[in-house]
UniProtKB/Swiss-Prot annotation:
Organism this protein belongs to: Ruthia magnifica subsp. Calyptogena magnifica
Gene3D superfamilies linked: TolB, C-terminal domain, TolB, N-terminal domain
Assembly: The Tol-Pal system is composed of five core proteins: the inner membrane proteins TolA, TolQ and TolR, the periplasmic protein TolB and the outer membrane protein Pal. They form a network linking the inner and outer membranes and the peptidoglycan layer.
Gene this chain is encoded by: tolB
Protein name: Tol-Pal system protein TolB
GO cellular component terms, A-Z: periplasmic space
Coiled-coil intervals: none
Cell cycle recorded as keyword: yes
Length: 424
């Protein structure tokens, strides 16, 4: 029984938050057809429905599956021929047993309709507060069994919400949530702009930019422990665009301390600052590759805004983008084979995907003003901010080009998303 995994889930304190509404935009007609049955229960029926509901929604949000429900609980001996006739390929069923006031036994099975075999089976002990978390974990396991790669459901998002308070005042919030926008938490509130939140590799810290002292400074917030916010030293001029090294010990920063915007590496323990670019042009928006041996950044050194890659071992810098006059805000895919970026098409700014080896650039969206792309941990999806009407929302597109779901707030704008690594 995997008690350790689940008895300590979701224990951080909620302050206040912006509720995001999730809208599934598209489903591919070729998506994998699967049925997620409500769990049979002994005790509390509602919790069994929650687990099935979360798994079902996760799969539909992925763009890879068409997950449906039934209005009854499927027992452990389903009629496979019936489901085969309905062109269902797999069935998820489970059982939930209440063993104390707030603790449950959870059992789950994934069945192949055609072979009639059990593809995955497991059981857990879970605290009431960990019900949604275990559903995300199980979604990842099922996704892996069916598609051969891990899902990105047991992860978190960070983003900035902006609310108009009237009389020209705005409230900025640094917020986090589960990958499906549930369990939202407000980490920081400010009347001054907050920008560029980015999760640390261990998911315990968030670096961001704040103007609370009437200048741009980089801070590190600890959302899950009672620890004082860490402010990086003040560097003359602008400090912006923080990005973590995979080892969690260094941050990339854009600084103008020498009069020109360049990329620097800042070592947190020694406070050592290393300059990585020296061009007379503006260099900004840098991020590391998954191994930390390369950085990608935006520069106007060619006379246009383009994306460049620097090899930190050889110090060689190569231009990565040649299509179009504007490419910016690039990030590496988890396998380092692709870059997601903002690409201008006419007067519109859209999310594009660049194959680094072939230089093939694919336009992924059809919006007017997209910004801040970031990959899911498994590389199958890209989250970004986009304008919708007079507001800003978060949207997700799969790397296959399907815009799968959207996160919006009735209270104001949502912008600058960042997707965490896998939770531990």
């Amino acid at each position: 029984m995997k008690q350790l995994l689940v008895l300590i889930l979701s224990l951080y304190t909620t302050l206040a938050w912006t509720v995001l509404e999730v809208t599934i935009l598209k489903q591919d007609e070729n998506a994998f057809p699967i049925v997620i049955s409500d769990f049979s229960v002994i005790g509390d029926a509602n919790q069994g429905k929650i687990i099935a509901h979360v798994i079902r929604n996760n799969f539909n949000r992925s763009g890879e599956f068409s997950a449906s429900s039934v209005n009854y609980v499927i027992n452990n001996k389903p009629n496979f021929d019936k489901w085969k006739a309905k062109k269902i390929e797999a069935i998820v069923l489970g059982k939930l047993e209440k063993i104390s006031k707030k603790v449950f036994n959870v059992e789950i099975e994934l069945l192949d309709v055609f072979s009639k075999k059990i593809l995955y089976k497991d059981k857990f002990v879970v605290h009431n507060r960990g019900i949604r978390r275990i559903a995300h974990y199980l979604s990842d396991q099922i996704y892996h069994v069916l598609l051969g790669e891990k899902g990105s459901f047991d992860t978190r998002l960070a983003y900035i919400s902006v609310t108009n308070k009237g009389k020209g005042e705005r409230e900025y919030r640094l917020e986090i949530s589960d990958s499906d926008a549930q369990n939202p938490q407000t980490i920081l509130k400010s009347k001054k702009p907050i920008l560029s939140p980015v999760w640390s590799p261990d998911q315990n810290k968030i670096a961001y930019v704040s103007f609370k002292n009437a200048r741009s400074e980089v801070f590190i917030q600890y959302p899950f422990v009672r620890r004082k916010t860490q402010k990086l030293p003040y560097f003359d001029g602008i400090a912006s665009a923080p990005s973590w090294h995979p080892n969690g010990k260094n941050l990339l920063l854009t600084l103008s301390k020498n009069g020109n915007k360049d990329i620097y590496s800042y070592q947190l323990s020694s406070k050592k600052l290393t300059r990585l670019t020296t061009d007379v042009g503006i260099d900004t928006e840098a991020s590391y590759s998954s191994e930390g041996d390369k950085i990608v950044f935006t520069s106007n050194r060619s006379g246009q805004v383009q994306v460049y890659i620097k090899d930190l071992k050889t110090n060689k810098i190569n231009r990565a983008t040649f299509k179009g006059r504007y490419n910016a805000k690039a990030v590496f895919s988890p396998d380092d084979k692709s870059l997601a970026m903002v690409h201008r098409v006419g007067k519109d700014y859209r999310i594009a995907l660049l194959d680094i080896a072939t230089k093939n650039l694919t336009i992924m969206t059809n919006n007017q003003l997209d910004e801040s792309p970031f990959f899911s941990p498994n590389g199958s999806m890209i989250i970004f901010a986009t304008n919708k009407g007079s507001s800003s929302v978060l949207s997700v597109v799969s790397i296959l080009g399907r815009q799968t779901f959207e996160l919006a707030s009735k209270a104001g704008e949502v912008r600058e998303p960042n997707w965490s690594h896998y939770l531990k």
